[in-house]
């Protein structure tokens, strides 16, 4: 599969959110929540945009604490990590101002779990202070299932100036992925088949493209037509095979699967 970035409707949604943040009025409302279901291409889009625009890119993970977050920011800004957090933050703010650099925090729910003394969601609070003081903005990227958690604190909720949502690719975007990323030529109808089997989930589209390339290699073809694929299942969406959640109803009766 080719190493190439394909601009889609999700890219347009993301850049629209960025424009809103750049043109916002209040410097204190420096947070933007960018969310979507797993597999829609959030990381793909923000990584491409962030690298092209000099953003500080942070990837949250299980076990990441506040000190790890601060260290990651300093490392990307070329600042020496130090024990005096106040001095380190001041230097971070100065560099962010000078570089006019935005901050992108992927898997931002990790920042909600951080605690410093009596401060909850310390990671998000730290980024909020940086964004406000440096007159820049912070993109907080998360799954749809995590969005509500950012409303638990009024201090954070009132600093979120904008929310943008990403979705599974439409048919035309799926066709663009297939045509631009596949290492072999693609005939009419193949892109539509990929969309039908994947539902436009970017991760599944990538798997489907790999399957197409494998079929072409086995058959010795430089171009794949719909007839070459036959009834082959290009991808398996394992999410569909998971046991459904059972939720209790409020009246005490058994809940249904969802």
Language-model features: where?
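Short glycine-rich substrate-engagement loop in P-loop NTPases that contacts/grips substrate
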Residues: 60-98, 118
């Amino acid at each position: 599969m080719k190493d190439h970035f394909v601009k889609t409707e999700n890219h347009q949604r993301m850049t629209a959110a960025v424009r809103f943040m750049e043109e916002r009025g209040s410097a204190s409302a420096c947070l933007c929540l960018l969310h979507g279901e797993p597999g829609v291409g959030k990381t793909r889009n923000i990584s491409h945009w962030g690298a092209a625009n000099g953003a500080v890119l942070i990837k949250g993970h299980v076990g990441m604490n506040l000190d790890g977050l601060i260290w990651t920011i300093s490392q990307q800004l070329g600042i020496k990590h130090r024990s005096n957090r106040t001095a380190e933050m001041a230097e971070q703010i100065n560099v962010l101002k000078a570089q006019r650099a935005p901050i992108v925090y992927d898997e931002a729910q990790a920042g909600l779990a951080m605690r410093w003394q009596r401060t909850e969601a310390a990671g998000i609070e730290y980024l909020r202070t940086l964004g406000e003081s440096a007159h820049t903005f912070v993109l907080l990227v998360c799954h749809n299932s995590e969005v509500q958690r950012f409303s638990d604190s009024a201090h954070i909720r009132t600093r979120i100036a904008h929310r943008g949502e990403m979705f599974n690719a439409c048919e035309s975007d799926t066709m663009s992925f297939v045509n631009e990323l596949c290492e072999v030529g693609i005939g009419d109808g193949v892109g539509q088949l990929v969309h039908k089997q994947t539902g436009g989930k970017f991760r599944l589209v990538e798997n489907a493209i790999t399957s197409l390339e494998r079929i072409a290699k086995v058959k010795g073809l430089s171009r794949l037509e719909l007839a070459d694929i036959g009834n082959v299942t290009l991808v398996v969406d394992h999410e569909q095979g998971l046991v459904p959640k059972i939720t209790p109803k409020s009246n005490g009766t058994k809940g249904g699967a969802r």
